[in-house]
Amino acid sequence: MSYRLVRELAADGVHVAVACRVLRISTSGYYEWRERPPSARAVADEELRAQIVEIHAMSRGSYGAPRVHAELRLGRGVRCGRKRVARLMRLERLQGVYRRRGKRARKTPAVHDDLVRRRFVADAPNRLWLTDITEHPTHEGKVYCAAVLDVYSRRIVGWSIADHLRAELVVDALEMARWRRRPPGGQTVVHSDRGSQYTSWAFGHRLRAAGLLGSMGRVGSAADNALMESFFGTLQLELLDRQRWSTRRELASAVFEWIEAWYNPRRRHTAIDDLSPVDFERLHAAAVDAA
C-alpha cells in the first residue's frame, strides 16, 4: 500500500509531503491513515515481521521464504502461509541467496564403477556417502575444502581444509567420517567424481582398508555428484562469497563454525522434511529404538 511506503520513506528521512507528491497521494489522506488504529491483521503482520527478521538474521541472511516459513511452522509453531511470509519479507527487503557454479578439478580415468547412477537415496545412515572438493580465495592464496556427506540425512560427517590439493586433503576428510560414524565394513558406498585425489592410491587404499565401497561418476558430469554440488553451492553462497577473506586461518575457522554450529545442527533442508540433519538422524534413531 502506498501509505505504508510513505511511512517507510519518512523513517528513512524523506519528507512526508515530498513522498506523497512523488507517489501522487493525498498528504491529508496519509495522516488520516496513520492515525487510524491498526487492524488485527496489521498487528499480527507486525508481530510476524519481527519473527521473520529474527529468523533471517539467525540464518546469516541465507534463508528465503520457504525456509523462513519452515522455521516458523516447525521451529516456533506459528501457523501462517508461505505467500504471506514472502510478502512480509518483501516489505522488509529480505531475501535468500542464489547459487553460482564453481570450478571443477582435473579428471582422470575411473578406478571404481558407478554404483550410484544418480540415485541419491539411502534408507538409513552410513549407506551412501558422497565426497568432493571446493576452493575459495583469500589474500594469502587459495583454500581447498574436502567434505563427506551422508545422503540419508544430508549431514556432513567428515571434512578437511588445506592450502593444497594433494591426496591427503580427501583422505583426511574420509578419516574424520570413519572416526565419527564407524560404519560396518562392506555396507557403505563412497561416491566421488574422477578428480586425481580420488583416483589416487592413498585414497583407494583407505577405502579398501576400511571396507568401504568406492564409486565414481562420469567425467565432467556435475549431475553424477549433484548433492555435493548442491552442498558446496550452499557453502559458497551462505558463507564464502559474502565477504573477502584475509587469511586462510580466518576462512578455515569460519567453515568449521558454519558446518558444526549451523549446517549440521540447525539449517533446515526441504529434502528431509524441513528438519536439520542432526534432528533428522535423531528421529531415525528414535524410530529404530521404538521398533
Regions found by a protein language model. Give the residues of each.
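Charged DNA-binding/catalytic regions of mobile-element recombinases
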Residues: M1-A291
